[in-house]
């Protein structure tokens, strides 16, 4: 399934397909000409998918480099962003090259922020691997890092060139990560999609949801797309959480 996010300045597609990660090289080649590509991921996701993703990209003609940050919220910081800037500079990435965010919401926020600020902005792609990131945070262009004073205090709005969602990645998620995504799905269904609400009500457990993930993720992405198209900058949202 392919959905288009249509915006005044930059439109892009959400590709939702079981097994899509196995063809990531072909997908990226459809968006970019062969060039240098930096992959930002975390240590957990790297062990699962890093080598395979690099192999696919190289087979499609891309020159790749990969950096894995520590998994978890602690990596969503200005200090980690600085490490990533240094890495991109060492790899000699220019504005004609690209960056891929491979991971959950932390990686997506962090990599998107780095891509939007490195050399005043380079092209990037989102490849979310958690349910929450697939139905929410990878779509819409919000990027941010935390500071000691607040969560999401420093950030940008920067739209990716595309989003690739492979429901197969949910099979390696911890149950609590699946539940985090389910909470967002339930919220979306309650607010905007009665049919999705009834569909969720018919599921027996988390495993049942994962088995029907492509259908459910697609429904949620349609909701998120509509929200983003209506108000790209979500001007009424307040996403920073000040710390005392």
Question: What is each of the regions a protein language model found here?
Answer:
Residues 108:
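Catalytic nucleophile loop
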Residues 203-240, 244:
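Active-site segments that bind and position negatively charged phosphate/pyrophosphate groups
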Residues 15, 113-206:
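A glycine/threonine-rich phosphate-anchoring loop and its flanking beta-alpha core
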Residues 1-98:
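ATP/NTP phosphate-donor binding region
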Residues 21, 46, 50, 81, ...:
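Generic structural signal for well-ordered, non-membrane alpha-helical segments
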Residues 85-102, 111-126:
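Non-catalytic interfacial helical region
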Residues 105:
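Acidic-aromatic/histidine active-site loop/patch
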